[in-house]
A protein has these predicted regions:
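ATP/NTP-dependent adenylation/nucleotidyl-transfer catalytic domains that generate, transfer
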Residues: 1-18, 24-41, 48-68, 72-189
């Protein structure tokens, strides 16, 4: 994009040292969910950094999640990569994002790259973590939207359908507005 548009800038920041400091300060290795909590902290450090630069430049932070990620499986960190001001592609299925990218002339290596959240110190992909590809999850999401249930499928289709439903249920709290405790009027005075 930088080569095509004069108003596009990029900065490379190595946040590893900052993350290591956070990890040293807060990590409780004996806790069962320590690894996931640290991975989510890495995502939130990225968000903090993006908002720092957005604030410096009076910009908004744009999300990169598509409909399958954001509303199908909820595969993002709350107040991390999900902490954005606008979500320009959140109403598009992954296949639609790829089609638009092709139309825009985006490099095919980017279009076909295996999605990864980059939160771990290894090469695991989103598919490794979820147990299904985005093509499979998109299929399952469409089937669910069409009123299908687990009993309509067998084999891998049933497995993928259940993966989508399981992730969706576990991550539903990310997909709905923050609950507000409504205080009765007689208690406010």
């Amino acid at each position: 994009l930088k080569s095509k548009y004069s108003n596009v800038e990029s900065k490379y920041l190595d946040l590893a040292k900052s993350f290591d400091e956070i990890k040293t300060s807060i990590s409780i290795a004996s806790k069962k969910n320590n690894e996931l909590a640290l991975a989510n902290s890495r995502s939130r450090l990225r968000m903090l950094t993006l908002y720092y630069f957005a604030s410096l430049n009076n910009f908004l932070v744009a999300g990169t999640g598509n409909k399958v990620e954001d509303f199908g499986v909820g595969f993002y960190t709350k107040y991390g990569d999900g902490g954005v001001d606008l979500s320009p592609i959140a109403d598009l299925m992954k296949s639609e994002v790829r089609s638009i990218a092709k139309e825009m002339g985006i490099n095919n290596d980017i279009i076909i790259a295996e999605p990864t959240d980059g939160l771990w110190d290894d090469t695991r992909t989103d598919e490794n973590q979820i147990g299904a590809s985005y093509n499979e999850l998109e299929w399952a999401m469409n089937e669910l939207d069409n009123g299908k249930s687990e009993s309509d499928f067998s084999g891998r289709e049933k497995e993928v359908f259940n993966i989508l439903k399981s992730f969706n249920a576990a991550n539903k709290h990310k997909m709905v507005p923050i609950p507000i405790c409504e205080i009765p009027e007689n208690l406010k005075n």
